[in-house]
Amino acid sequence: AWDGTDVLFPIDDGGNVHLYRVGADGTGKPELVIGGDRQVTGFDVRGGRVVFTAGDATHLTDVFVLDTDGSERRLTTHGDRFVALHPPVAPERFTATSPDGAEVEAWLIRPVGFAEGGTYPALLNVHGGPFTQYGNRVFDEFQVQAGAGYAVMYCNPRGSSGYSEAWGRAIRGPIAEVDPGSGWGGVDYDDVMAVTEEAVRRFPFIDGSRLGVLGGSYGGYMTSWIIGHTNRFKAACSERAVNNLLAEEHNSDIAGIFKMYVGATHLDAPEEYLRQSPVTYFRDMHTPLLILHSEDDLRCPISQAEELFVALRMLKRDVEFVRFPGESHELTRAGAPKHRVMRFDVLLEFFARHLLS
């Protein structure tokens, strides 16, 4: 609480995370307390002061205090030395128009060493969730990709947080009784493809014949879905993905969640679960694919990856599969350092082979 009469809370806000307050009795409209093009990652309140951590697109997270007079002070400079040695490339914001007219917020990071007149391959990143967001923070994945010579694209398609309830609920299934939408692989797919084409049009240094796509969890789902519905990308990496929604409801540690999205249980509408599953479109997948998965993943069990790999091998498609023993769904964020480095090495070698050579 702010002073016993207010409640403070963070909210995703168009790529940012801001801090708001509202009356503890529920009256009044929420009031912005801490804003800006940045993401607040934690906070506490004492004596009318708010101590919080925040970072933005070119600065790592540090500690700040908002004093009682409304002034703000930075208390730590932990990230300055790293940023001085490895300056993050600032993103450029743009928007793309989806086929139904929806405006999708997106960003592009130019490759390190960018030179006017040159052409570069590009990687489209799709976030997990799906109810989360990309935005104004330093993300090591993007900086590593840019450092390897890629233009880096990312966006917040429908299903993401940070925009509106309607935006987040747009990918609920068409059979849902409340707020029916397109289902997974509907308008979200349209949005990420619109962003891809807009980036190629807007940034002439992107070589549209050398595009890659990658993502983890829901982002892995979307990667698998994309290559089952278009050959636009020259290479893809599907990581810790959901490839079979029906199987996910049987053996995941979040079994039951898809009732909220699909609009019915897997027992009542198995055909709808399969319609929205990449497994249904294996025969349409022709893009060279790298599959990355942790063997101890309980969120998206490794059988999700095995199903994809075995099917594509049976179809004699170009597919590679790397398994990480002893790792969970959190490999990229909390895995063993040796495995996190190995993952980057495998990922970059794969895309270099297909997009840089």
Task: Kindly label every feature range from the protein language model.
Residues 53, 126, 239:
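Conserved residues at the C-terminal ends of beta-strands
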Residues 1-119, 130-148, 175, 197-201, ...:
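Peripheral, non-catalytic segments that deliver or gate enzyme domains
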Residues 125-128, 144, 154:
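Structural cue for short, hydrophobic secondary-structure segments
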Residues 154-357:
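Active-site-proximal cap/loop segments of hydrolase catalytic domains
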Residues 105, 127, 329:
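Histidine-centered divalent metal-coordination motifs
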